[in-house]
Amino acid sequence: MLDINAFLVEKGGDPEIIKASQKKRGDSVELVDEIIAEYKEWVKLRFDLDEHNKKLNSVQKEIGKRFKAKEDAKDLIAEKEKLSNEKKEIIEKEAEADKNLRSKINQVGNIVHESVVDSQDEENNELVRTWTPENYKKPEQIAAATGAPAKLSHHEVLLRLDGYDPERGVRIVGHRGYFLRNYGVFLNQALINYGLSFLSSKGYVPLQAPVMMNKEVMAKTAQLSQFDEELYKVIDGEDEKYLIATSEQPISAYHAGEWFESPAEQLPVRYAGYSSCFRREAGSHGKDAWGIFRVHAFEKIEQFVLTEPEKSWEEFDRMIGCSEEFYQSLGLPYRVVGIVSGELNNAAAKKYDLEAWFPFQQEYKELVSCSNCTDYQSRNLEIRCGIKQQNQQEKKYVHCLNSTLSATERTICCILENYQKEDGLVIPEVLRKYIPGEPEFIPYIKELPKNTTSVKKAKGKN
């Protein structure tokens, strides 16, 4: 959330900056004025509460004097009761006003960084850079790693390897259900182990996160729309929890309420988060329906960093650089794009996506999102840094950044399309030592069903 002082001119804030940011996001500008008005109403209630406390103290003293003098104090006792009832009403109104004010502030997004493209259309995402393996020029439907024709979609390659079973998965789980089998399991575990080893070698602390969170904690790190579109709820009697959509959520709360008093020595803190993740994908009906690219349950390796505010943009570049190095080591062509202002989630001041090339589908698809959330999350979670200096008016919060390293099922999909051959799959060299037998190649062992995706695509061209 933003600091309330940022909305108030009298506190050194500039509401016009927030309004301009809201406009870039395509969100409500009027909300800023509503927050300012509600803050003033809350201040008035606080003033009324203070005044009632003063009056109550004064009346209580007078009652004491009357009792001491053995004089009648019925009128003062009646006045005290009246003031106490009024105070109770004011406390209730103040609590409700505070709740409503915080709720509205939480609806306002982070201040969009000046370098972000101002647009509501993701077609205007900024192309930052591209990378391809040496001697690969992205010819039509050619697998990047093997040079063979990319005749099959990722899910068809996995079917021919007997690497997953979607039919039984759907029968048991429902929409987008699946079982990984055989080398599907080994590939997934290889990516998990390689990803953790990769980040560990760069100084990240591996952290396996819990997959459920209390509602009150989740509310501090996930925005309201995620509760409706993304998160699964788990209810046990009156106990209400949410399954995580990313390990960023529990890891962001890992240091909640803590204070890094010596930031130069204690920060940055870098975590390599690992967890299973769960997403309803409520707004993605019919999108990426093939295979295991977009599913309800998956595994993910996440970068999460806490840093000093002055160093967060340097850390942002470092984190996207780590993800790029990871995909370069896998030999997967990709591009990095800067996300337009209208597509940023509330917490992000700026976001880069890494989109890898899928040769069968002839398109780039998102594998990584890297965001600098500045102090938007840490303010809600009260993660502070530095020793408060004399005359310092504002609290200083750490900056929080997150970046996917690998959502492993998605990464597998990209490997399957780029490492396929006519008779099987070449295993990326960096993954081989994590797979039993350290195979260089896995042959196909199953035939595809009739009228599968590649057949339909071929018919469509004829």
From Swiss-Prot:
<dbReference type="InterPro" id="IPR033729">
    <property type="entry name" value="SerRS_core"/>
</dbReference>
<dbReference type="InterPro" id="IPR042103">
    <property type="entry name" value="SerRS_1_N_sf"/>
</dbReference>
<dbReference type="GO" id="GO:0000049">
    <property type="term" value="F:tRNA binding"/>
</dbReference>
<comment type="function">
    <text>Catalyzes the attachment of serine to tRNA(Ser) in a two-step reaction: serine is first activated by ATP to form Ser-AMP and then transferred to the acceptor end of tRNA(Ser).</text>
</comment>
<dbReference type="InterPro" id="IPR002314">
    <property type="entry name" value="aa-tRNA-synt_IIb"/>
</dbReference>
<dbReference type="GO" id="GO:0005737">
    <property type="term" value="C:cytoplasm"/>
</dbReference>
<feature type="binding site">
    <location>
        <begin position="366"/>
        <end position="369"/>
    </location>
    <ligand>
        <name>ATP</name>
    </ligand>
</feature>
<comment type="similarity">
    <text>Belongs to the class-II aminoacyl-tRNA synthetase family. Type-1 seryl-tRNA synthetase subfamily.</text>
</comment>
<keyword id="KW-0963">Cytoplasm</keyword>
<dbReference type="InterPro" id="IPR010978">
    <property type="entry name" value="tRNA-bd_arm"/>
</dbReference>
<feature type="binding site">
    <location>
        <begin position="246"/>
        <end position="248"/>
    </location>
    <ligand>
        <name>L-serine</name>
    </ligand>
</feature>
<dbReference type="GO" id="GO:0005524">
    <property type="term" value="F:ATP binding"/>
</dbReference>
<feature type="binding site">
    <location>
        <position position="295"/>
    </location>
    <ligand>
        <name>ATP</name>
    </ligand>
</feature>
<feature type="binding site">
    <location>
        <begin position="279"/>
        <end position="281"/>
    </location>
    <ligand>
        <name>ATP</name>
    </ligand>
</feature>
<comment type="subunit">
    <text>Homodimer. The tRNA molecule binds across the dimer.</text>
</comment>
<dbReference type="GO" id="GO:0002181">
    <property type="term" value="P:cytoplasmic translation"/>
</dbReference>
<protein>
    <recommendedName>
        <fullName>Serine--tRNA ligase, cytoplasmic</fullName>
        <ecNumber>6.1.1.11</ecNumber>
    </recommendedName>
</protein>
<dbReference type="GO" id="GO:0004828">
    <property type="term" value="F:serine-tRNA ligase activity"/>
</dbReference>
<keyword id="KW-0067">ATP-binding</keyword>
<keyword id="KW-0436">Ligase</keyword>
<dbReference type="Pfam" id="PF02403">
    <property type="entry name" value="Seryl_tRNA_N"/>
</dbReference>
<dbReference type="InterPro" id="IPR045864">
    <property type="entry name" value="aa-tRNA-synth_II/BPL/LPL"/>
</dbReference>
<keyword id="KW-0030">Aminoacyl-tRNA synthetase</keyword>
<keyword id="KW-0547">Nucleotide-binding</keyword>
<keyword id="KW-0648">Protein biosynthesis</keyword>
<dbReference type="GO" id="GO:0005829">
    <property type="term" value="C:cytosol"/>
</dbReference>
<dbReference type="GO" id="GO:0006434">
    <property type="term" value="P:seryl-tRNA aminoacylation"/>
</dbReference>
<dbReference type="InterPro" id="IPR015866">
    <property type="entry name" value="Ser-tRNA-synth_1_N"/>
</dbReference>
<dbReference type="Pfam" id="PF00587">
    <property type="entry name" value="tRNA-synt_2b"/>
</dbReference>
<feature type="binding site">
    <location>
        <position position="302"/>
    </location>
    <ligand>
        <name>L-serine</name>
    </ligand>
</feature>
<dbReference type="InterPro" id="IPR002317">
    <property type="entry name" value="Ser-tRNA-ligase_type_1"/>
</dbReference>
<feature type="binding site">
    <location>
        <position position="404"/>
    </location>
    <ligand>
        <name>L-serine</name>
    </ligand>
</feature>
<dbReference type="InterPro" id="IPR006195">
    <property type="entry name" value="aa-tRNA-synth_II"/>
</dbReference>
